[in-house]
Amino acid sequence: MPAGAIVYDPAYRDHDTGDHIESKSRVDAIMERMREDERARRVQILKPFKAAPDQVGTNHDVQYIASVRRLAEAGGGWLDLDTYCSSRSYEVSLLAVGGVICAVDAVMADVHNVMAIVRPPGHHAVWNKAMGFCIFNNVACAAKYAILSKDIERVLIVDWDVHHGNGTQASFYDDSRVLYVSTHQRPFYPGTGDFEEVGSGEGEGFTVNLPLPPGVNNDGFFYVYDRLFIPIAQQFEPQLTFVSAGQDIHYADPIGGMLATSNAFRGLTERVKSVTPQGQVIACLEGGYDLHALADSTLAICGSLFDFPTQAEEDDVNSGISKHVSDRVERAIKVQSKYWEL
């Protein structure tokens, strides 16, 4: 079997956010955990390249891109209430987009699955502004690169971050080439991602949202995927799959309110792999703010992507599916059965 790879560069630490919760210590914790694990240490590291501004421009307004560059060159400042831009953040944001594009090149060649450990995260960034710690939308830019440069016709984007990926959804809302599926806590930031948000025009039916209450455990997430997301993805038959991997659904996360353990991330990744068996799965770091939980959960994702064992996390909250979850799944099925056999 071809080898998998991790995309990482120490320069991702140079997006300097000070004592902000989205800080360089996130990638430090992940990479330290990777070095501690004998099998993870063997996975090849791909060095990313900076995306060209016109590659970012496939998904973002050129004036917005230029405004980020100017702010960084002026020494930095706040792009919005949540998102800080340091003097190096423009260059690092290009490197984050380039890292996921690098992953596309790799899986379209001879690499079997990729984990992109990049920052800043991306799934909230929209056409003309930063949002929610995100400057450029890494996954959306890379998906457009795959479509425009690699003749890919069907891209699946799975987003399990505790927050809805409003930016990614908006990028492909009228595009039937991209199937976007998301679980997210609701009510919660950014307030988008309702059941009835299904796409428009040619993209109608290619956006699948399942807003969930707080407190969903591993079994609840597995049920969502087994009952809704995987049957739809199997019918879509993706040629390339991205995961917006936000590990803030872990029970220890200080922002989210979910009850997943690190075991959930391995199980969810296994399910995603099942619909892209040719090895063209790219997991891209989004959220996750408890450093220990983030590191263990990302290692669990890598264990699934690269087929090595990881230690199961003991817990006592992950048996059973609540009626709150099953009721919401049935509501989503009622909406989506107009477009898919469910």
Task: Briefly describe each language-model feature range.
Residues 38-41, 63, 150:
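Short glycine-centered helix-capping/turn motifs at secondary-structure transition points
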Residues 11, 35, 61, 105, ...:
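Residue-level marker of positions within ordered structural domains that often coincide
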Residues 2-7, 66-342:
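A general "terminal functional-core" signal
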Residues 24, 50, 58, 62, ...:
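Low-complexity, intrinsically disordered regions enriched in charged/polar residues
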Residues 49-73:
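Charged, often glycine-rich, active-site loop that binds/positions anionic groups
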